[in-house]
Each structure stands twice: as structure tokens, then as C-alpha cells.
Amino acid sequence: MRNKRISIKKVIFYICLLGLIILLVMPILWAMLLSLKTNNEIVNSPLSLPQTIRFENYQRAIDTIDFSKMYFNTILLVVISTFFSILFTFMSSFAIARMVFRNHKASETLYLFLLIGIGIPIYVLLFPVYRIDSLMGILGTRLGLILPYVAVNISFNTLLFTGFLRDIPGELEEAAIIDGCNLFKLCTKVVIPVMKPTFVTIIIFNAVYIYNEFPFASTFIQDNALNTVSLMTSMFKGQYSMDYSGIIAASLMIMLPELVFYVILQKYIISGMTAGAVKG
């Protein structure tokens, strides 16, 4: 009777799991079907199978978009912004979690202040950051995007870094200091290797966010030569029409690299997100 009850629970669990998988995969499969249709088919019968498979939609997307330039611009922003965001937030998180403050409330206040950004919508920041970039003379440049990208990731990075750093046994650091490690060696030789899953998780989340980011890019980029992949939809807009099949085909091509990147490193995401969540 017990085995029968367990088997029923398993069946229900797997049915729910299958339903969730279908729910998550269906939009991608639907987009793949739409990318093989004509614009008329997409507008008039979006749920039907394509009457004729049209791979030329992908060729048109390649001809319309300068993928090499857009990928270069995007990857450059991703690498620089992610590097400095991680550098600054790791140092601040290490100070909050591991260094002794005379006033404990001061460190907690600083920590909470850094976490405030999690609850601030990106669109609220557009106008203030636009004004700051304009006053600094960096509006329309890569630096004008790198600075806000670094800033908006501070709260999330601090949350993960501080949570993991507080879970590292103090004896590990004490032993390293007794062996002659200074603060720099303590971080690079002891702490960072232990935090590898957390670092990989933060790199992935920061990189994927910047790769897909649209509000800042669409507002601050004023030169087509600096366009990122998130702005490719503008290439398919006419004055009175829109190339839906071209947009969908290009979107799938742009999504593929980050999907592969995520699948390869997914085990680090799970271990990194759970790091610090369980004591002992």
C-alpha cells in the first residue's frame, strides 16, 4: 500500500514536471515555427504549421544585421562591465563580511544600503543616468553604458558574495594568516578558489543581463556603429511595416550562444545560488 502511494506521488510529480517543461519549451518551439513562415502567415495564422518551410528568413537576417560588429560591441560591454562589477562588489562584500568594524551597525547599514538597488526598477534610473552621462560628456559612448551596467549589478553581486563569505569558516583565514598570507594573497589564494561556484554564477547572471539589456542601450546609444544585439529589432522596422519573420529568425540566432553558455555552466549556477543558504 505504501509503495503504491509512493508510486502515485511519483507519477503526479513527473506529470507536473513534464507540464512545466512543456510550458517552458513551447515558446521556443513556437518561435522556431514562426521563423520558418512568411509574414502573411505569421499575421493571419500564427498557430498553424508553416505551409512552406522558408530557411531564407535566416539568410535575410544575416544579410540585414552586421552580426560581427554587434557581437563585438556586446561582448566588449559584457566583459568590461562584468569584470569591474565583480571586482568592486567582491572587495566591498569581503570588507562587510570578513573585516571587523568598530561599529557593527555601520557595516550592516552599508550592506542594506547596497541591497536597496534590487528593488529599484531600471526605468526609474533612465533619466537620472541619462543626465549624468550628458553632464560627464560620455553620452553615446561605450563608457556611458559600462558605468550603469556596473552599477545596476552591485546589489545582486553583493547579496551573493556576502552570503557566501559569511559562511566561510574563520579558521581557514586564520590558518592562512599564520602561514604568512597578506590580505591580497588571502583573497586570491584562499578565498577566491573556495568561491569558484559563486563567481561563475555571478559572471553568468551579469553577462546574460548585459547581453539582453535593452532600456539603457536603446536610450544611450546614438551611433549605429555601437549597436548591441538587443537593438537588432530596429533593423527590421520599416515606416509602415515590420519584418516579423526576420526579427524572430534573428532573435533565435542571437539567443543560441547564451543558451549554450548557460547549459554548459548550469551546474555552477545551482551550486552558486545555494552557497551560503545552509549552515554547517
Task: Give the location of each predicted region.
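A hydrophobic, multi-pass inner-membrane permease signature
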Residues: M1-G280
